[in-house]
């Protein structure tokens, strides 16, 4: 999981069974705020200033990046990265709402607006 104190939210995911969730930490209590039917296999990147989380979603032998609103769980954007393997090497933030994706055989730069 990753804690996002600016939003009183903890983000959790299940790489084996699938699932992505935002868990509220308001008032030092844990409560599920939102859930998405996704299958992340990599660590997310958090953009606290825009309230966005970027993580991969590996399904049906294809990987994509998704952008999620941290507070609401709304899926804001998604982009295929033309990867057949998501072994979780890394996601790295760029400089302006962009991210670098690297896995075996694939390197991509993804920008969203």
Enumerate the language-model features and the residues they cover.
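Short, ordered coil/turn segments that flank beta-strands lining enzyme active or ligand-binding pockets
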Residues: 6, 16, 26, 49, ...
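Structural motif
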Residues: 17-22, 61-66, 106-113
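C-terminal closing repeat unit and adjoining cap/tail of repeat-based domains
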Residues: 58, 62-106
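Hydrophobic beta-strand positions
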Residues: 12, 22-23, 46, 67-68
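A short beta-strand motif characteristic of beta-propeller blades
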Residues: 29-36, 74-80
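Repeated scaffold domains used in trafficking and secretory/extracellular systems
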Residues: 1-6, 37-49, 83-96
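Short beta-strand elements that form the blades of beta-propeller/WD-repeat-like
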Residues: 6-14, 51-58, 97-103
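Short loop/turn segments that connect beta-strands within beta-propeller blades
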Residues: 24-28, 69-72, 113
């Amino acid at each position: 999981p990753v804690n996002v104190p600016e939003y009183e939210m903890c983000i959790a995911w299940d790489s084996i069974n699938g699932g992505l969730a935002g868990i509220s930490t308001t008032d030092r209590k844990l409560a599920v705020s939102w859930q998405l039917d996704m299958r992340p296999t990599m660590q997310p990147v958090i953009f606290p200033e825009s309230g966005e989380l970027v993580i991969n979603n590996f399904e049906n032998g294809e990987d994509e990046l998704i952008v999620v609103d941290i507070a609401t769980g709304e899926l804001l954007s998604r982009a295929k990265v033309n990867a057949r393997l998501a072994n979780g090497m890394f996601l790295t933030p760029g400089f302006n709402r962009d991210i670098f994706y690297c896995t075996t055989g694939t390197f991509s730069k993804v920008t969203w607006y």
